[in-house]
């Protein structure tokens, strides 16, 4: 079974990036899935702790060969010039044995504007900075929250897919925030 780690809404935070890369190295995950808003903090957000987008790009480039990424609403062509993995696709798909993960940032496709999905597929998105791991109707919804600018009183968080279970995990203490089994 494929093991994936998900990080969203880094927004140029070097401490968050360092922690994500530390956990990725320890996790045994094959891929680090970045769900957009990689380098820029955006006009609606305050600067995250340790805002250093060029350093974040350098650190992420060290694992570029293990990154799958999608473009967020704060990502631009200029950001792509610093990164050694593609970030300009509005969505990607990861095919599992019996279902697919539809990866998107959440500003184009999301819970209120679903792409065409089949029963048991998983909508994986960021953008809201709010953790979600649940089944809604025939599909699963998964948002790992934000590693740098958490909202809704939640801690900074990331996601894991391991043994057909999607988990949102607190970045600081590894506690489980939300979890859903996706085996059809």
From Swiss-Prot:
Homotetramer. Shows phosphodiesterase activity. Shows significant activity toward bis-p-nitrophenyl phosphate (bis-pNPP), an artificial substrate commonly used to detect phosphodiesterase activity. Also hydrolyzes, with lower efficiency, two other artificial phosphodiesterase substrates, thymidine 5'-monophosphate p-nitrophenyl ester (pNP-TMP) and p-nitrophenylphosphorylcholine (pNPPC). Shows phosphomonoesterase activity toward p-nitrophenyl phosphate (pNPP), with much lower catalytic efficiency. Optimum pH is 8.5-9.8 with bis-pNPP as substrate. Changing residue 74 to N: Increases specific activity with bis-pNPP and pNPP. InterPro entries: Calcineurin-like_PHP_lpxH, Metallo-depent_PP-like, MPP_YfcE, PdiEstase_YfcE_CS, Phosphodiesterase_MJ0936/Vps29. Mn(2+) 2 binds at residues 37, 73, 105, 127. It comes from Escherichia coli (strain K12). It comes from the Bacteria. It is an enzyme of class 3 (hydrolase). One of its GO terms (molecular function) is identical protein binding. Mn(2+) 1 binds at residues 9, 11, 37, 129. This is Phosphodiesterase YfcE. Its EC number is 3.1.4.-. Keywords: Hydrolase, Manganese, Metal-binding. Gene3D superfamilies: 3.60.21.10. Signal peptide: none annotated. Changing residue 74 to H: Increases specific activity with bis-pNPP and pNPP. Confers a gain of function and converts the enzyme into a an active 2',3'-cNMP phosphodiesterase. Changing residue 74 to A: Decreases specific activity with bis-pNPP but does not affect specific activity with pNPP. Belongs to the metallophosphoesterase superfamily. YfcE family. The keyword Metal-binding applies. Hydrolysis of bis-pNPP is significantly inhibited by sulfate and phosphate, which may mimic binding of a natural ligand.
